[in-house]
Amino acid sequence: ICFTHYHADHISGLPGLLLTMGNAERTEPLTLIGPKGLVRVVNALRVIAPELPFEIECIELTQSEETFTLYGYEITAYKVNHNVLCYGYTIEIKRNGKFDAKRAKEQNIPLKYWNPLQKGETVEADGMLYTPDMVLGPARKGIKLTYTTDTRPVKSIEEHAKDSDLFICEGMYGEQDKEEEKAK
């Protein structure tokens, strides 16, 4: 879960979400990413959800831009311009090349190893080493999502949103508020 900033409208749903995950018998750790202060905010909200069947791992952002690879996703956090410390996020999902069954058959790769090879895993079995490059074509275009919220226009948004398949940009003000904001 990536937090942009710690205003109530962006964090107050966390306790309910944590409790729902716990009730759904989640046991694997949950990673939270957010600006500096994340641990303090999460601990305060955990008063409502103190007992969970999974660990919470917090990553506090300290740089103007940081990139992580988690669970196969490449996540880039970048600062935007709000009245509190605030980040936007770009999430990219890389995609392997297409599986070539003909190549797998030509190389006598047993069917039971096709699935892990298709997922990009190397298989060592029966004295043989099977690698994804033996059966996968060139990498395919991945999926890129960019999310930003509660910010004034800044160059970093344009740079990160470039070539996104989905760009979500929540604005604070509508056209009717333009003149009032200019006056501020």
Q: Where are the model-predicted features located?
A:
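Glycine-rich, phosphate-binding/catalytic loops in enzymes
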Residues: 17-20, 49-51, 163-165, 184
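Metal-dependent phosphodiesterase/nuclease catalytic metal-binding core
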Residues: 62-184
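Hydrophobic packing residues within well-ordered alpha-helices of enzyme cores
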Residues: 14-17, 42-45, 157
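Short, charge-rich binding segments
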Residues: 22-25, 50, 80
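Active-site metal-binding motif and surrounding structural segment of the metallo-beta-lactamase
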Residues: 1-33, 57-62
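Generic structural signal for residues in well-ordered beta-strands
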Residues: 55-58, 75
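A gly/proline- and charged-residue-enriched helix-loop-helix capping module
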Residues: 37-47, 58-63
